[in-house]
Amino acid sequence: MYNNLKTGDIIKFGSYEQDNNAGNGKEKIEWLVLKKADNKALLVSKYILDCQPINTGSNKDKQKWETCDLREWLSSTFLNSAFTPEERSSIQLSHVPADKNTENPGDPNLDPGNSTYDRLFLLSMLEVETYFNSYEARRCAGTPYAKSKGLYVAEYDKTTDGELASYWWTRNPAHAMEQTNPFVPPQKTSGMAVVDPAGVMPAYGGLLQQLDTGVRPAMWLCFKD
């Protein structure tokens, strides 16, 4: 059923709570096809499916994708919740390169770490730039469930479908600004790059413990002839 896929198509695969009504069960997840290659396709969720921090604790050493808590959450909690064993067998264990921050590629404090192998991952800044050809195309809205978890929703910026957009994570380390004292200007600290509601990837990202930024899982889905 997937052999005729092309870039820009939307497919349904897996299930996750989305309408914020657990009583009617999980809803099918919609995925945007970013790339087709032989018998597999690179997908990213059409909507922001959840609202999670990069790290649940205060460890700023977990700024890299390979060591962050969100990677573990995607690879365990989300993977097991959203897909059946049969569906999981179709998700490729993929090489996930440690791309540099495209806004500050030479900054030694933004070392992306080592490449990983994951079934589910976040897009890098480079991949966002490669697969989305406009700011409007990068804008993404959250599901009612994600919004119930505290997802920030813009007042004016809308997706191409006319929905109000939100922030979503990439997997690149970034600088973030943190204000711990109202009498002192914000200080630069560790963060992770984001796509903002306008579809821009600003030079300063989100704090690692930030609770209002969304998750758009990505994966390589394999299919049989």
What residues fall within each predicted segment?
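Collagenous Gly-X-Y triple-helix signature in extracellular proteins
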Residues: M1-D225
